[in-house]
């Protein structure tokens, strides 16, 4: 690294940050995270702010590089039609010819995120034709404490419930589309943190208040039947079978599992087939413990 390179990169990243600032979709989702979190670093854009970028030094980058780009902090995943032994031999030969400094493993410090939201309701005006709206649900993982269900399955049950209530075939989505409350898609994003599940549901709609009201009511129903569970499990199994035709998708999923759980879920098919209505109801019943935030991006003329 040189000071010249650092200065050049500062300019490039600053331009990117300014571009994000002008994108309503980005501001909707990350604005929601900013409203939900109080201490968790996920409240910030990965790119940081312009003032953050200006403070970065050559020495900061060297420390980050040595901590991040080191074999002790890496894993390799190869998917496709190849000889595993040959692949391992090639990688081992290449790595044996390289020298690396002693690895100073970073100490991970997690800030305890409180069970509250920074902002319950937030509005801003941007260059949009139709208001963009999001509702964020913050569900504490300790709500499921005492259940004899491992954390991976809890997440699957939570995700299954959200698909039943808000997915493509859900009653709510059909209601909102048939009444023209929404005319486009409805996006759902699940964020799994150390202490919380955070689900953000977002749309473009001329009726933000009604949409927010119906989303909250639908989440609070906290009911699920056996037919729903069987239907969603079968859909998940079908998607899993098709998914294995996507080499890059498989690679990405393995990466996610290793990062999230420290290992790949080889038995995901068996896990899906073991999901049942009794456990689903136990998980759904505990969703009464949650808090919400709502974000609305309005057209400029409504300022």
Which residues make up each language-model segment?
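Active/ligand-binding-proximal structured segments within catalytic/core domains
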Residues: 9, 16, 32-33, 135, ...
């Amino acid at each position: 690294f040189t000071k010249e390179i650092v200065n050049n990169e500062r300019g490039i990243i600053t331009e990117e940050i300014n571009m994000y600032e002008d994108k309503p979709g980005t501001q909707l989702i990350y604005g929601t995270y900013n409203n939900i979190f109080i201490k968790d670093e996920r409240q910030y854009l990965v790119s940081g702010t312009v003032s953050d970028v200006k403070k970065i030094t050559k020495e900061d980058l060297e420390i980050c590089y040595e901590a991040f780009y080191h074999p002790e902090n890496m894993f390799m995943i190869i998917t496709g039609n190849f000889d595993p032994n040959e692949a391992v031999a090639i990688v081992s030969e290449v790595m044996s010819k390289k020298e690396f400094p002693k690895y100073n493993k970073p100490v991970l410090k997690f800030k305890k995120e409180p069970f509250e939201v920074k902002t319950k309701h937030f509005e801003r005006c941007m260059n949009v034709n139709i208001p963009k709206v999001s509702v964020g649900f913050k569900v504490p993982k300790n709500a499921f404490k005492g259940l004899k269900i491992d954390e991976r399955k809890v997440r699957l049950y939570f995700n299954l419930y959200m698909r039943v209530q808000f997915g493509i075939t859900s009653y709510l989505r059909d209601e909102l589309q048939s009444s023209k409350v929404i005319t486009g898609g409805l996006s759902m994003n699940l964020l799994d943190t150390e202490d919380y599940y955070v689900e953000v549901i977002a749309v473009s709609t001329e009726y933000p208040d009604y949409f927010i009201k119906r989303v909250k009511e639908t989440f609070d129903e906290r009911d699920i039947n056996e037919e729903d569970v069987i239907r969603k499990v079968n859909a998940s199994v079908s998607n899993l079978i098709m998914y294995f035709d996507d080499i890059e998708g498989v690679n990405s999923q393995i990466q996610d599992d290793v990062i999230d759980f420290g290992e790949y879920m080889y038995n995901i098919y068996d896990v899906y087939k073991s999901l049942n209505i009794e456990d689903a109801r136990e998980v759904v019943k505990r969703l009464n413990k949650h808090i919400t935030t709502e974000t609305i991006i309005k057209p400029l003329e409504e300022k």
